[in-house]
Amino acid sequence: LANLSNMAEFLGLKSLFVKDESYRFGLNAFKVLGGSFAMARYIANELGKDVSEIDYNYLTSEKLKNEFGQATFFTATDGNHGRGVAWAANRLGQKAVVLMPKGTVKSRFDNIAKEGAKVTIEEVNYDECVRMANKLAEQTEHGVMVQDTAWDGYEEIPAWIMQGYGTMASEAAEQITDRPTH
């Protein structure tokens, strides 16, 4: 946590803290917390385990590959969510397919491609990319949609993504010495 004591004083507050996510895994964003947690939870469920029973070493092991096999995680993104999914898939020895909408900045495309994902810029808007990615996931053997947008019938994985984002709050609670008021 970054202690913004001067800003706190200026605002008439006892203290002000900011959770800086710009250094997490070298990705400059918190979004990886959601996608990676949802992917781990999906894998655990497929193996009949609770996510608390598996750790990073197991998720990246040959044993997991033998027990779970290979999945392809699909998503649509404007940038950071897709990069997080691609990063997690790469670390877990899984595949990622990321669809990006027209007008996407090349640097965002490149950042995702560097993580080993199959990434494309589609000539459609973000919402249509979500629909396309979901259709591809449904048509692909062991395809899994990992989207931070929910719709009727697709709520579980987005909820897991939100739970993954909660890691920030848990970490902040561990790092702060005084109980926050708000």
Where are the model-predicted features located?
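PLP-dependent amino-acid enzyme catalytic core
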Residues: 1-182
